Amino acid sequence: MFQQSSSLEHKKIIDDKTYLIGSAGKMLIVDSILIALDYSAQPILHLFDIKNNIYINGMGEKGQGPNEFLHPTSLIHSSTNSFLIYDLLDNTLKKIWLDSLMAGNVFYEKIMNFNSISNSFVFPTAYDNYIAFGLYESNMFKLIDQHNNDIGYFADFPVKSKEEKKIDHRNIALAYQGTLNISPDKKKIVYVSYYGTIIGIYDIQSSVINQKFLLVCDYPMYTVQNEGSGMSSPITKEGISAFRDVYVTDKYIYSLYSGNKISELRERAFEAKDIYVFDWEGNPVVHYHLDVPINNIAALPNDKKIYAISNLPDPTLIEFEIDL
């Protein structure tokens, strides 16, 4: 599928003794600042100056107090001086200004507190509404207006068979969980699956979401285990650990892929050393094979460098030079 392939070697750019990351999460580049989420430790935000190659600071605390976070899961570009965080556990989209972070202060504005606890990801669109992805009774996406009302539900997971369609849709959504990112113009969104091997690109309009591209190489292998009011769709040991992260620029989609069998490598199955780059039409551009496994990715807007965090053995910020 990918006619162009290249091997990349990493470079450490910042002294790893100047920072300590617990469990590296999503990353975002705003101007010359790289922001990285930390899922397991405090501070929850790490700031790197990738122009001068220095660690700026770590900040942000978990909690329910003013300007604290419960469980932030995504970073979303907002402007040259701000970004958004979706906090999963309090269903809130929060806006943060870089100026305040650079001054050592964490201050956010709550943009919207959503009604549903079923949203895994929420992004603002170009049409003054929001696109959400989550564990719904039908479909995989929904649009929400500025007044917190549902506009409608759209698209669905590409299940393997008619029999699978008879399963409770929330179980399907649990098995087909993945990660997403929205284009800089906020008019397109990409979904990649954590298990199986699925990538989908969708056009966003003011009142509808249309599937533009879909690639299915493998389906998630799972069982349904519902007891009482609880729901579960555990992945079997024969399942494939697929995409670990996805990052986007104006031109390209960078998908970080593992492809390992969980039964063979266990925890190491979630290590990823391959980046598959697509354009926004779904055309394959290039396959990068990395010299070290990484946890997440970010790319410069000009598509000249990829940044990642790799366990070397401690979580360390590294870069790869590319030429797209």
Regions found by a protein language model. Give the residues of each.
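A short helix->beta-strand "capping" segment at the edge of beta-propeller domains
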Residues: 1-22, 283
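Loop/turn-rich, solvent-exposed surfaces of beta-rich toroidal or solenoidal domains
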Residues: 236-277
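Blade/loop signatures of beta-propeller domains
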Residues: 1-10, 219-224, 264
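Conserved blade-ending motifs and adjacent loop-strand segments that build the rim/top face
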Residues: 218-228, 280-301
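Structural signature of eukaryotic scaffold interfaces centered on beta-propeller domains
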Residues: 23-28, 73-78, 120-127, 170-185, ...
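Surface-exposed loop and turn segments in beta-propeller and other repeat-based domains
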Residues: 11-18, 57-68, 107-117, 151-173, ...
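Asp-box/WD-like beta-propeller blade repeats and closely related beta-sheet repeat scaffolds
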Residues: 90-91, 97-134
